[in-house]
Amino acid sequence: MDSRILMDAGIDAESALNRMMGSEALLERLFRRFLEDGNFSALSAAIEAGDREGALTASHTLKGMCGNLSMDRLYSLFSGQVDLMRAGDWEEAVNMMQQIREAYEDAVSAVKRCLE
């Protein structure tokens, strides 16, 4: 696994590996689950539909997943979005989606490259 590729996408591979007690196989399995997870699509759909509760649930789930995988850039963005949603600042939370989408796409691309 090329940690430089991951680091460029805001993923601390060393920290993630430490969380997995050094098991690269476990980390790879969880990275694959991240790629298959539907919460980003659910977040986008909920925002489009104005479903605030659904958006909060999806964003909060993504925050936890990214935290567990040491996806620091995404974790920070989702944390901010969840905080805004909980504070009732829906417009600002929605405005974060472009930045979140770019960081998410970077992370997906990096993980895919490392799993090839």
Report each predicted region and the residues it spans.
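Two-component system phosphorelay core
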Residues: 1-116
